[in-house]
Structure formats: C-alpha cells, structure tokens
Amino acid sequence: MGSKYPRSLRCCLPLWAFGLQVTFILLFYFLIGQDPIQADHKFMAIYQVIQDLTLVAALGFGFLSSSFRRHGWSSVAFSFFMLALGVQGTILLDYFLNWVLDWNMIKNPFSPFLSIQRATISTLPLLISAGAVLGKVNLVQLAVMVLVEAMTFGAIRVADKKVFRIEDHIIMMYGHVFGAYFGLTVAWWLSKSLPRRRHENAQTEKVQMTTSSSLFAMLGTLFLWIFWPSINSALLEGTKKKNAVFNTYYALAVSTVTATSMSALSHPKGKINMVHIHNAVLAGGVAVGAPSCLISSPWIAMVLGLTAGLISIWGAKCPQVCLSDLLLNPSGIHYTFGLPGLLGALTYYCLHIIAESRPSNLWIVTQTITDVGALSFAMAMGMVTGLLTGCLLSVKVWRAPHAVKYFDDQAFWEFPHLAVEF
C-alpha cells in the first residue's frame, strides 16, 4: 500500500525558507548597522548572557522535546530551525519596535548586539508553543507559525510598554504563558478536524518513550535547569538580578525534590515517572520568574517552587482537569509553563501589593489592575492568534502530514539503511 504522506516538500520548503532568508538578508543590509557598544567589559557581560540563553533555547528546548521514540531527529532539528529563523525575524522586529517606542534613533541608537539578547529570549515563547505541535506539522508550517507568533509577541510588547507601562522583565515572563496557550490553541484546532479515535490511535504508539529518547529529554531538562536563572535575570540589573538568580535556584531545587517525591507517591507501587521529572522539575523556575526580583527571603521562593511542583504533578496525573487530554498535548506544556506561569503572575501581584501598599495609596491598586490586564491581554492574544494560526496551518497548500504520519521522522529525514522511503 502506498504511503499516505502528502506530496514531497522539495519545492515548497526550499522556496519558502530560502526566499524568507534572502528577504532577511536584504532587510539587514538596509536597516542594521554597526553596533554602538564600545566598552569590552560590557560586551563580554552581554555575550555571556547570550551564551546562556542560546544554550537554553538550542540544547534545552531541543532535547526536551525529543522524548518521543520516532520523532527525536525532527524535534531537535526543527526546534533549532525555529530558533535560527526566530532570532533573525525578532531582531528585525526589534528594530521597528525600537523606532515605535523611541523615535529619537540618533540620541538612542539601535544596538544589534543588545537586540540579539532580547531576540533570543523572545524566541522562548515560540519554542514553548512548538512543544504542542511538533510531530503534527511539517517544517513549512513551523516557519509560518514562527513568523505569526513573533509578530504577535512583538505587538504584545508594544502594548505592554506603551499602554500598560509594564517592565521588560515582566513582559518576557508573561511570554511563557503566551507561548503555552498559543501552542495549545493551535494544537486544538489542528486536531479538531480529525476524528478523535483516529487521532488517538495515530499517536498512541509513536508518543511512547524509549530509554535512549527519555535520556536525551532528561539532558534537555538538565540544560534548562542549570541555565534557567539566566533567563529569569537576563533583563535585570544590580540587586534585582542577584535576587532573581538566587530565588530561581531555590525554587528549582524545591520543585525537583517535590516532583520526585510526588511522582513516587502518585504511583501505586511507588515508582517514579520520567515524564514528571522532565516537566515538573522546571515548574518552580517558571513560577518564580516574574516575582523573582521582589522576593526578599529564600523561604518564599521555596514555597513557590513547592506549589509549582505540586501543580505540575497534579496536571500530569489529572489531564482531564488540566485540559491536556482534550488538547492531546503529550509534551505537557500546560502544566510545565502555562499553570506555573499563572501562579508566578499571581505571586508577583501579591508581593507587589505588600511591598508598595500604604494607607490611601490608590496607585498600587491601579497598577495591579493594569498588571492583571496585561497578563489577560497576553493570554487572549495567545488564544485568538493561536486559533487564527491553526486555521492558517490547516490550509492544504502547506501539505501537512496525515494523522497516521504524526510523530514519524521517516516523513522528513533520509534513512539510508531503510529499503522503503516515505
């Protein structure tokens, strides 16, 4: 019987990807000039942060999504492709945002080097959302998704800066929530057009983990765990940066212990589930992201890490409650990034009120309402644009894979040792 996989991407993929890359080169030629940074010490400090962020994006998220037994190559390579494409597009977008937010480009010149730092951290929501659709889409669809999501997140940044007056650090922390619900909405729409039983049967065998694939996913978790303090502190300075690093380590440590112990407790025979370790150990770092610079005592960060770990394990064990079963999301981004991100935002609001509250101080009330509005706006934009992106990716021109070819590397990669090609 012939393969049910759609026609070859030989024409569609090179034309789209190469044309997009040439367009980026031309835009860089006309818009991006020499970097104004002169001090070597400042250059090296920023470069170290960029290195950490790149390790998180390329190795951490790449290997984290490689746990599926027949989709390891595509998960790692496609995530890397999204990172490379997303950074270029976000740098160009950052140039236009810099012009929109600050028209005086002579007094405050655009710094491509600083933009690389912002662009790398801005691609993290893209990689988070990719966890919900990897294995169900091809590389052309991912490229389209990168462009739409990058522009949407750029619009959110403009709105948060100009309308809500939110700090860059908080905007980027909201990006975890935005990326999670954007990806979940896209995945929901893509699965909506398929019969439920057929979709589940197509995924049952291929989403299972093997020892080697699970080990690579654990390697990605370790990279994320080690360098997550760099994410939470990348856009902070001075004492706030130091507090963010310390508190992130505390929260990560506690969520790791919580995830391990609760995973054993939730199993009838006291065995640990590796999926819980992949995801729940990171929940503390995600939850502490927004309030990390406001936390003055380690115990607060540790309690937050404990709560985030419990929520993540609860989400993994009760998928119907956390919508994971409805959305058919085997990567678990909802209870790894979505719910812990919301917990972190709630904690940030509470700590902000406690730190700034004074008798008859209406400013803190107004600011809190504004912060809640900014988060709600990010979530709403994520779900609305995710729905539109799902509709766009469903168009047949992208030659999407059939459900029977979900989570299958053979649809995209050359395997010389196999006699039958797809």
From Swiss-Prot:
Keywords: Cell membrane, Lipoprotein, Membrane, Palmitate, Transmembrane, Transmembrane helix. It is found in: Cell membrane. InterPro entries: Ammonium/urea_transptr, NH4_transpt_AmtB-like_dom, RhesusRHD. Palmitoylated. The chain crosses the membrane at residues 13-33, 43-63, 76-96, 113-135, 137-159, 170-190, 215-235, 244-266, 272-292, 294-314, 335-355, 372-392. One of its GO terms (biological process) is erythrocyte development. Pfam families: Ammonium_transp. One of its GO terms (cellular component) is plasma membrane. This is Blood group Rh(D) polypeptide. The lineage of its organism: Eukaryota, Metazoa, Chordata, Craniata, Vertebrata.
